[in-house]
Amino acid sequence: MRILICDDDTLIIEQLQKYIESYFESNHLKCPELVSFTSGESLLAEKSEKDIVFLDIEMPGMNGIYVGNELKKANKNVIIFV
């Protein structure tokens, strides 16, 4: 499983990664691969598997709503948090 985080604020990315890692650790689960992006364009250019995606709504260039819609077109099973 891969969890992707897309936010133009790297501090938000770091904090969300810590929360996710802490959740898996506290539940004695193997943490999945965490991948971060600072733009919607770079996330959409990534062709690898996308299981769960956390998106920032307001980003320069492509906003999170647009990116989420594009992800759903490519994979209707992707889970998206905005």
Regions of interest found by a model, annotated:
Residues 7, 56-57:
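Active-site residues of response regulator receiver
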Residues 10-35:
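Two-component/phosphorelay signaling modules centered on CheY-like receiver
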Residues 34-52:
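Acidic, metal-coordinating helix/loop segments flanking the phosphotransfer/catalytic sites
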Residues 39, 63-67:
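Acidic catalytic/metal-coordinating carboxylates
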Residues 60:
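The feature encodes the CheY-like receiver
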Residues 77-82:
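A short, hydrophobic beta-strand element within the central beta-sheet of small alpha/beta folds
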